[in-house]
Every structure is written in structure tokens, then in C-alpha cells.
């Protein structure tokens, strides 16, 4: 008879796999074993996700906050909020995808897919994360609270996109770029701030294009398994035009961010950060190889550095002003 006993978290993640983004010797192994599946479910062991969620908000806050103290306060709140929100989003994603994840090599070791945590426990954990995130959100102005709540449908529905469209990365872009309108609303002390639509929309569109590009690179890791499992992605949708598609997305990102911040700030130190970011994005495209999943993961992760280049320049622009 087939053994149906569930493996422990450590056993699941020590099982040999050709490719996974879970580090079996990560810091989380020093924690009590009963916490391991929760750490992995929330991706607390892989900070790249919350970095990428955080950065669009970190771009807009220095450009719009009144006073350095307010800028620092908001950036810290957004940091805590990004870690919490990303963790909650991962739980939602894995609840939707637990059966699909079993068919994909990179995700088969995730706690819900591997059976190391139950659905009830995951839902309770999600509730705790949601409550903590709400505690952060209510510290912001009313306009920001309403803007944050407006993002919930995107967070909940994103996992469904890969089932119905070849472009789920575009939906992720809309979701992960929500820090732009949220940061804009949070930086205003008024309940109904004035929104310069052209600048806001250009920056948001640029961020969406950036997310689309880097998550298409991320999807390169799973192309073979996704094709077998019937999961859709922009990497599969673009096919042999993948490099061209990523190049176009990154070009649109630079143009959108550049035009938006120019309308908002005019010339300033931020331009240097955008140039460095653009060079980094070009470097990614040059080294992208669809036959190298591990290399694609490294390129994807390098987008934290690309985004921090612009963040540093935005902070300098704020201080110089």
C-alpha cells in the first residue's frame, strides 16, 4: 500500500530537487520545527518579494512627503506593511494554487502543496496577518486607508489570472505597483488629496511595466512544468519573443517612471538613479537565458538592487529640495 503519511517540513525541503527557491539551510532552520511551515508559507525566508512590493511606494514617498520626518515615518510604516501584506498574499496564493503547486518542481515543497500545514491553520494564519496589516493601515490618512482597501480585489484575484490569461504578470504588476497610489495618498495629511493624474498614472504604469518584466523573467523557471500543468504565464505567452517582450516592458518602465517623475519634480538627482536603474535592466536582458532557471532566479532577485538605485536617488532629491 502506498505510504500516505505527511512529511515534516524539514524532510520535504531536504528532498532532492533540481530547482527550488527555498534555501534548506536558511536561518529559519534555527527556529522551532513547528514554526517552519508558517515561515515558508509566508515566504519570510525569501525577502525578495516584500522588497519588490515595497519599492514603488518608496519611490513615491520621498517625492511627495512634506518634511524629512514624515518621509522616514511613512517609509518605515510601508516597510512593515509590505512584509505583512506580501506574507498574506502568499498565503492567499498558496490556498488557491495548492494543487497546481504539486505539479511544479519549484513549488512542490511549499507547505500547503506538501501537506505540512492544513487549510484551517493557513486560514487562521492569514487572519492574523490581515489583522496586523490592518493595524498598520489605520495609522495612515483616510485617503490612504481607502486606497489600501481598494487593492484587496487584486490581491485575492491575482492567483486566478494564471488560469485564464497568458498575462498574469500584468495582473501582478497592477497589484505590486499599488504602493504608488497608496504612497501618494499616505504622504498627504488631507483626507482628499489633490491627485495630478498625468504624473500618477505615468509612474504607476511605469511600475506595472517593471513588474511585468521581472516577473516574466521569474516565470522562466517554471516554463516546462507550467506547460505540462496547463498554467499560463507571460513567459509561455511570449515564447521565442520572450527577450523582446522583457526588453519592451523595461523600456516602458523607464519611460513611464521618467515622464511621471519629471512632471512631478522636474530635473533633479532622481534622474541619475533612473539612469542607473535603466542600465541594470539592460544588463538583465543581456544575460537572460530561458534555458537557465537558476540564472533567471538570480536576475529576478537583482531587481531589488535596481529598485533601490531609484529609491536612493529619490531620497537625495527630497533632501536636496
Where are these regions (language model features)?
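Membrane-embedded alpha-helical segments that form the functional core of polytopic membrane enzymes
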Residues: 54-96, 106, 127-135, 145-156, ...
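Extended hydrophobic alpha-helices typical of membrane-associated regions
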Residues: 33-36, 255, 262-321
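Intramembrane alpha-helical segments
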Residues: 36-40, 110-195, 202, 259, ...
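Residue-level signal for inorganic ion chemistry
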Residues: 42, 97, 118, 168, ...
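Multi-pass membrane catalytic core of lipid/isoprenoid biosynthesis enzymes
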Residues: 54, 76-82, 98-148, 228-267, ...
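The first (N-terminal) embedded transmembrane alpha-helix
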Residues: 43-63, 177, 311-313
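Hydrophobic residues within membrane-embedded alpha-helical segments of Major Facilitator Superfamily
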Residues: 52, 59, 84-85, 129-132, ...
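Cytosolic, membrane-interface loops and tails of multi-pass inner-membrane proteins
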Residues: 2, 11-36, 90-117, 215-239, ...
